[in-house]
């Protein structure tokens, strides 16, 4: 199967069957989403959503968080993975938002990556979800699904995967395609024993069509 045919089939199926796809993190503004995405690194969205209501209540703006300390933030986020590092990142992020960006979460990916705790994946999430830019954030789900389906040619890194996906996915579909792949990887194309029989992508899936599934 030609790659163009595979992409067309996969994207058309998602567009028809999953017309609405969005992040499962709870937030009301760009600042809150930035916090949630930083916290979600190697942690489930469910766990993050359990702690962010109190965190958002007590630190409603970058200014308030910047005036706090990592020790105080730690007590709010201690149940997530790596709370010590993340508490330092959050305070540092808030301080830089105030000092360099007038308290406004930037839309530029390079600018976002200057913030403590913000790598390329997080920057792409913010650019895509908040500002609807054609940025493809590659997490473990996107990386796995893209390779398994055959959207990428055995990409070895998230950056390789990102570049190949944005090359083939129409620009206007990149923001929602990010969510399609994440949700598909989270609930259907899971890491171990993917639920192939209930998957609608079988006609185009390289893994399913392979005589030897690995």
Q: What role is predicted for each listed range?
A:
Residues 2-213:
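Catalytic cores of DNA base-excision repair glycosylases
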């Amino acid at each position: 199967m030609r790659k163009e045919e595979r992409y067309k089939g996969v994207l058309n199926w998602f567009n028809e069957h999953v017309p609405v796809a969005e992040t499962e993190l709870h937030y009301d503004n760009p600042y809150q989403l930035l916090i949630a995405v930083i916290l979600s690194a190697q942690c489930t969205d469910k766990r993050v959503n359990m702690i962010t209501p109190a965190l958002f209540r007590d630190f409603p703006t970058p200014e308030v968080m910047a005036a706090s300390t990592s020790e105080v933030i730690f007590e709010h986020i201690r149940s997530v993975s790596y709370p010590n590092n993340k508490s330092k990142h959050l305070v540092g992020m808030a301080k830089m938002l105030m000092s360099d960006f007038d308290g406004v979460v930037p839309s530029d990916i390079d600018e976002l990556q200057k913030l403590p705790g913000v790598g390329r994946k997080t920057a792409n999430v913010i650019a895509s979800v908040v500002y609807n830019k054609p940025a493809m954030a590659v997490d473990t789900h996107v990386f796995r699904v893209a390779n398994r389906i055959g959207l990428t040619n055995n990409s070895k890194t998230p950056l390789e995967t990102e570049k190949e996906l944005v090359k083939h996915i129409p620009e206007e579909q990149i923001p929602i395609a990010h969510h399609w792949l994440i949700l598909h990887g989270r609930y259907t194309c899971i890491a171990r024993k993917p639920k192939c029989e209930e998957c609608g992508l079988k006609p185009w899936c390289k893994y399913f069509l392979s005589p030897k599934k690995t």
